[in-house]
C-alpha cells in the first residue's frame, strides 16, 4: 500500500516515538509511507536548529519513508489563540502540501491529536481521495476544554465549532482506532457506529531502552542523577498531567528522589513550587534525545505516569506507559480509569487516585521499602505485558490489517 500518514509531530521532536514507530513499522512491511508533518517546534514552541521555516521541505527517512514538512505557526505556550493558530496553520498548509506535493495514496492514516490533522485527508480533490483512517490519541474538543486553554464565551464557541468538526471527521472516516478501551463508550455517545471503532493501543520500539537492566549508582552518577531510591517522570510537563500533588507527596518523603525529565507549560510553576518550598529531593532536567532517554529510564527504580482525574483522561492511555513497561520498570501511576486498571491487572506497579496526596505518600513509602529484587520482578511483569500487547509486531499487525480492510472497502472517498 501507499500510505499517506498525517501527524503534526514527528522526529526530531521529543516524544514522537509513537508516530515514528508507526511510519517505520509499516515501511518495514514493504509499504510506501509518505509522512505529512510540520516543522519541529514541540515542546518549546521554537523551531529546532537546522529547520528554518519554509513553504515546503522534503526528507528521505528510509527507503520506504518520505517526510513532507508543511509550514506552521510555531507555538506551544498557554495562549489559546496561539495554540489554535499552531493547530490550524498546520492543518491548512498540510492540506496544500497534500494537493501539490504528495503522490496519490491508497489510504490516508491520520494521527489525531490535534483533530485539525484530519483536514488534509478530508479536503483533498477527488483525484487524490482515498479511504481515511483516524488513529485517535485523545478526544477533541474534550481534551481542549478540559485542559483549561479556552473558557467563557470564546471557549463555548470553540467547543461548539470543534464538536461539529470532529463529528464530521468521524462520519467521513472509514475506521477509527482508539488507544484505550473506554474511548469506545465516549465515541458511541457522540454517534459513532460501534463497527467503525477498533481497539488499537500504541506500541513503542524498545531499541533505545535497556530492559532488565538493574539501576546502578554508577549509571546515576554518570548522568548527574541522585543516588538512592529514585523515581522518575519523563514526558510532557503540562496541566493535564497533574504533577503538583505528587511533588507535594515527595516533599513528605525526603529519603527518596523524584526527577522530572521534560518540558511543558506547567514546568515553570512546578519549579517555582519546589524552589519556594525548599523541596530538596525533587529535580528537573530538560528533554532528552531518544538515544539518551533510555539511559535515564534505566537509571530509575520506578517510573511515574500521572494524569488528572477527568472523564476524558480516565479513557486514555498515555504512550509513556508503554515505554515504561517496555523498559521493564515498575510504575507508580497517579491516574484513574484505564491506566489504573492496566497497572492493577498486570501487577506491574501501584495505582493511586489522582490528587490524593496521602495515598501517593503511602505508595511512595511502600515502593521505597520494597526490595530491589521485588521491584525487578514487577518490572519483568510489566515487560511481559508489553510483549503481549504493545510490542511493535503486535501493533503493526493490527494496524496493517485495519488499513487493508479500509482500502478494500473504498468507503467515504
Question: Where do the language-model regions lie?
Answer:
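A short, well-ordered alpha-helix in the C-terminal region of glycosyltransferases
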Residues: 228, 366, 373-389
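Carbohydrate-associated surface elements
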Residues: 182, 203
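N-terminal subdomain of nucleotide-sugar transferases
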Residues: 1-60, 248-251, 411-413
